[in-house]
Amino acid sequence: MNGARSLLATMVANGVTTVFANPGTSEMHFVAALDDATDVRAVLCLFEGVATGAADGYARVTGRPAATLLHLGPGLANGWANLHNARRARVPLLNVIGDHATYHARYDAPLQSDIAAVAGALDGPVFNPQRPEDVAAETARAIAGAYGPPARVATLVLPADVSWGEVATPPAHWPVAAPTSAPVPDEGLIHLAATRLRTTRSAIFLGSAATTQSLMDLAQRIGAASGAKVMVETFPTTMDRGAGVVQPERLIYLSEFAVAQLADLKTLVLIGANEPVGFFAYPDVPSRLVGPDCHVVALAPPGVDAGAALAALVDQLDAPSAATPSGVAPEPPSGALTTASFAAAIAATMPEHAILSDESNTSGIHLYGATAFAAPHRLLTLTGGAIGFGLPVAVGAAIGSSSRVIALESDGSMMYTLQALWTMAREALDVTVVVLSNRRYAILDFERQRVGATGAGDASERLLALDRPTIDFCGLARAMGIPATLVATAHDLVDALRRSYATEGPSLIEVPLPSAF
């Protein structure tokens, strides 16, 4: 029994049975140990950013951590952007990184780096066992740290000699992380929130811990009883949506519009969320989105029991059941492909219980409204703003769930983690990839104006346009073993979506869109 086998045995004892891996030399004993770990599903990813994003997606749909397997500091660096998204999503994730042998580090070999410093920037705990005998206990501590609350990215750095070294006396029972319950909200804050909801113009602001159907139902009851509007953060980790589900008002992404959206509020009650702030700074636009006379009540910030907070407010307000708004999904569209017809096609065809991994960016401007009364589904969004999340998260969601996953990908973002297509094909995952190809970084056209950057000459245009050459997304998909279709009309898109949903395994649909949104 060596350190690597001890790590795997402890993972299995704690229910961590999926590993998204891009291994190197330092991880070979872990890889070898997988041959005997029949309870573990090991998934090869061709780029570390796919592995980390897949672990994020898996956690979003299961509520449980998957593990990554990364190679030294550069492997961690390659996967860091999607670990950042996982940090912002507040999902549990066990980030396993192989390191040089403990005695080799002092020689400053080419791949030597300060792994703990890079991992520490994720704001989660970092564990570094120095003996094979320490691996099991440190792994259990890391898994406990991943669960939180709040959930976090927990990193375990495994030196090569600790991995291959023998455990002198394996434990009779592998250590199991003790679960920790989220603290309940402060009674005084509950009373304050209830009083202000009754007496001031208010909103309940829901974060990712409060976006299940049952908790949004409670929020709807509170809103109906108090007159407060129910809002949701711009980019929730996972959100139940569709017909029969409460539809909170989504905070607008653009800061100046979000400021106007919140301007008349005197109270903002936070449930599972932090206070909203601008995504970026802009000239003459405040970073803080609520007005100066708005009282923000942090009733249940991340890590505090959001369900208990909502239930307490229901009791305080004696809030009766409230009707859920009803409506119908759009009809299948025809005619030209536009951002509106694309959104309508998704809404009209979406199968029940689908999972929507949404990195449509500017091309998805109509998506939230169009899918309000689509078939019930789960929405996964770009929590941390680091693009290249949609395809990897779709991989993890498909492995963690039996539902059809629909990955909506803008063309620029797709090129960050294109290797995820290969993993979809190899694992035969039921993922429909919809590439929204407007052939430019369209968001930057808009942002250039917003920040007051002048000029639109040839040099700046070359940094925003995705042409010369035009990317053949269908060709790229086929090269990785995925059937692909290029559509020309909205009717074609509807047909292609329906065929995809009826066919096992992955497929890709390329949707050409106008460059302006």
Residues covered by each model-derived region:
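Generic enzyme active-site microenvironment
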Residues: 231, 357, 408-409
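Thiamine diphosphate
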Residues: 96, 104-113, 225, 366-517
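Phosphate/pyrophosphate-binding active-site segments
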Residues: 2, 133, 157, 171, ...
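N-terminal alpha/beta PP-like core and its mobile active-site loop of ThDP/TPP-dependent enzymes
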Residues: 1-320, 431-433
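Active-site diphosphate/adenylate-binding microenvironment
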Residues: 4-17, 22-26, 30-35, 324-402
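Residues that mark the start of a beta-strand
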Residues: 65, 201-203, 355, 378, ...
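A general structural motif
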Residues: 47-48, 105-109, 179-194, 251-252, ...
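Short conserved AdoMet
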Residues: 151, 198, 263, 291, ...
